[in-house]
């Protein structure tokens, strides 16, 4: 029984991030434990980030507060719906309110690139404070918007602008959890998804308490963005935590240098970081004491042949080389992930817009329930990525997207509709997280912010094409028939397979070349040390 318990504990412990690794021992604000800091960042992401994505409740609040009610006069009033049928007063008000989502999303993805650039240049604390300033301004302007002070447009400009700007700095905490970056990314991604519930909570409070719309908005501005700005001031560092790749060479080199099989080809593995501070902790110790017994001499020989982490950190041959942004961005791998992320955006957005045309009422209701629960498979995918890597999971998700639309083609069957909902539920669970993890594990950490920002900008803006596919093509040209667009998207998903397989091959080759470079430098260092000892 004790052996079984010990075995179970060992397996659970193996799933935990490495605590002995130098990267896990980096300094945190006020020396806060890294797990406590993670919980703080999770609450931070939950309270703010992309709250406007809870659009159903958000738009209901806008209608009820009378936003754009001033346009329902004259001819526009003639298009008013029957009383009690809808939330809006006239069709023009509905159009104006719905346009706010597109405005916010365009600002959101445009500012993603700006946020990424600032994250790499100015630092995480300044970026977080800027983002929360945008968020606070958005809700304050919304609180006072009305016929005499029409500030609803700038409110949603700031709301979109602050979404990624405020939350990007929290992603850098993954550098404190070497070997578990995907799980930590997925955890933060789940919290960002849960922030979509904020408008629902605010709407429920407003309707149940009877307080004014102004009080709801100001109250959230204080309890959300302003509180998170205080958290950012104290708990988000000025300088980003050092990336895993800053130390991967010296840590992996230590394993190779001190391994009896160092002469054999090393396996390509994802290497964790090592601490630059180790460079001041000493060099190789060579004993000059000749008054030793034979066993002592043999032990001393073994010790002097070992190469320590501090030696490797000191050695200039293991210092991380600086690379330019263009050398990372203008590559097949980066082009591939941007293209894949864009296709994911089309698949996800069109399904959500057109679901009412190919799902029965019960299946559509199931979709509404499952969508917020997509945080659950998000965490599971994070564990799987840590085990098998990001590319197999991306290929798996592309297959899940394919199955989603295959079931849509067969939507005459109610069973196929429910399978479609289940597949889509899994597909959207790790929508942005998969891109973050791929960039973090493939490219130089010095450009992490810029790379995810540009990818979000490209994928986000091009995902707006789904509005054309649904509004102009499906509704306008095809009279509501979704099949032609669904088949076209199926073809696009299938065409992604050769690109993704080529990306996997290219990425594996890149990792192998990095390992071979480390191996050659280790052997060079060992030879130099042997010559010095002789």
From Swiss-Prot:
Optimum pH is 5-8. It holds the Pfam family MFS_1. Disruption phenotype: Impaired parasite growth under conditions of restricted arginine availability. Does not cause toxoplasmosis in mice. Residues 289-302 have a biased composition (Basic and acidic residues). The chain crosses the membrane at residues 35-55, 99-119, 126-146, 154-174, 182-202, 216-236, 329-349, 365-385, 388-408, 419-439, 451-471, 483-503. Glycans are attached at residue 246. It is found in: Cell membrane. Belongs to the SLC43A transporter (TC 2.A.1.44) family. This is Arginine transporter 1.
């Amino acid at each position: 029984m004790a052996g079984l318990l010990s075995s179970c504990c060992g397996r659970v412990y193996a799933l935990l991030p490495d605590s002995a690794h130098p990267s896990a021992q980096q300094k945190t604000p006020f020396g806060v434990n890294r797990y406590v800091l993670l919980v703080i960042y999770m609450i931070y992401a939950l309270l703010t980030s992309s709250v406007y994505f809870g659009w159903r409740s958000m738009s209901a609040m806008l209608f009820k507060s009378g936003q754009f009610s001033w346009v329902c006069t004259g001819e526009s009033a003639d298009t008013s719906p029957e009383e009690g049928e809808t939330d809006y007063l006239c069709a023009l008000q509905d159009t104006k309110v719905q346009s706010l989502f597109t405005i916010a999303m365009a600002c959101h993805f445009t500012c993603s690139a700006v946020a990424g650039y600032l994250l790499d240049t100015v630092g995480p604390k300044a970026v977080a404070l800027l983002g929360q300033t945008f968020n606070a301004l958005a809700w304050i302007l919304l609180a006072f918007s009305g016929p005499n002070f029409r500030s609803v447009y700038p409110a949603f400009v700031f709301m979109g602008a602050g979404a990624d700007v405020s939350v990007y700095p929290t992603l850098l905490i993954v550098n404190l959890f070497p070997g578990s970056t995907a799980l930590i990314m997925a955890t933060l991604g789940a919290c960002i998804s849960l922030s979509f519930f904020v408008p629902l909570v605010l709407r429920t409070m407003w309707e149940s308490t009877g307080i004014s719309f102004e009080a709801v908005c100001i109250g959230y501005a204080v309890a959300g963005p302003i509180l998170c700005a205080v958290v950012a001031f104290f708990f988000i560092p000025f300088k980003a935590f050092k990336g895993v790749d800053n130390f991967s060479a010296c840590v992996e080199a230590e394993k190779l240098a001190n391994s009896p099989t160092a002469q054999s080809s090393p396996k390509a593995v994802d290497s964790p970081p090592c601490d630059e501070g180790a460079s001041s902790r000493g060099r190789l110790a060579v004993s000059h004491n000749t008054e030793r017994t034979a066993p002592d001499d043999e032990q001393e020989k073994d010790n002097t042949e070992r190469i320590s982490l501090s030696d490797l950190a000191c050695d200039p041959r293991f210092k991380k080389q600086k690379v330019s942004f263009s050398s990372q961005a203008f590559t097949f791998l980066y082009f591939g992930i941007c293209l894949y992320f864009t296709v994911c955006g089309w698949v996800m957005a069109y399904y959500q817009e057109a679901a009412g045309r190919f799902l029965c009422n019960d299946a559509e209701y199931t979709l509404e329930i499952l969508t917020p629960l997509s945080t659950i498979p998000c965490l599971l995918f994070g564990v799987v990525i840590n085990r098998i890597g990001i590319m197999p999971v991306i290929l798996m998700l592309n297959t899940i997207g394919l199955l989603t639309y295959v079931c849509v083609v067969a939507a005459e069957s109610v069973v196929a509709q429910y399978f479609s909902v289940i597949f889509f539920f899994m597909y959207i669970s790790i929508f942005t997280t998969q891109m973050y993890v791929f960039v973090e594990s493939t490219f130089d950490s010095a450009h992490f912010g810029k790379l995810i920002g540009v990818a979000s900008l490209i994928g986000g803006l091009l995902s707006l094409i789904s509005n054309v596919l649904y509004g102009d093509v499906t509704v306008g040209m095809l009279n509501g028939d979704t099949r032609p667009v669904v088949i076209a998207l199926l073809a696009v998903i299938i065409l992604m397979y050769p690109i993704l397989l080529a990306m996997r091959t290219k990425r594996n080759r890149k990792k192998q070349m990095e390992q071979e470079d480390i191996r050659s430098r280790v052997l060079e260092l060992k030879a130099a040390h042997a010559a010095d000892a002789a």
